[in-house]
């Protein structure tokens, strides 16, 4: 199963690929921009 966690302190998320790259750098599976405020959410196994 895959879960998502919101990354605090990263500011607005404009491009999914940038978010995914940042998440992978911190050990997550990837990530994408979501929500009205466009924040980066990282993917992880849960």
Curated annotation (Swiss-Prot):
Top-rank taxon: Eukaryota
Disulfide pairings: 3-46, 13-33, 19-40, 23-42
Keywords, sorted A to Z: Antibiotic, Antimicrobial, Disulfide bond, Fungicide, Plant defense
Stretches that traverse the bilayer: none
The UniProt record lists the keyword Disulfide bond: yes
GO biological process: defense response to bacterium; defense response to fungus; killing of cells of another organism
Stretches of the chain forming a coiled coil according to its record: none
Tissues where the protein occurs: Present in seeds, cotyledons and leaves. Not found in roots or stems.
Complex and partners: Monomer.
The family this protein is said to belong to: Belongs to the DEFL family. Protease inhibitor I18 (RTI/MTI-2) subfamily.
Entry function: Has antibacterial activity against the Gram-positive bacterium S.aureus and the Gram-negative bacteria E.coli and P.syringae. Does not have antibacterial activity against the phytopathogenic bacteria R.solanacearum, Rhataybacter sp and Erwinia sp. Does not inhibit trypsin, chymotrypsin or alpha-amylases.
Name assigned to this protein: Defensin-like protein 2
């Amino acid at each position: 199963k895959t879960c998502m966690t919101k990354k605090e302190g990263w500011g607005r998320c404009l491009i999914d690929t940038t978010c995914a790259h940042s998440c992978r750098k911190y050990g997550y599976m990837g990530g994408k921009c979501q929500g009205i405020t466009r924040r980066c959410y990282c993917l992880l196994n849960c």
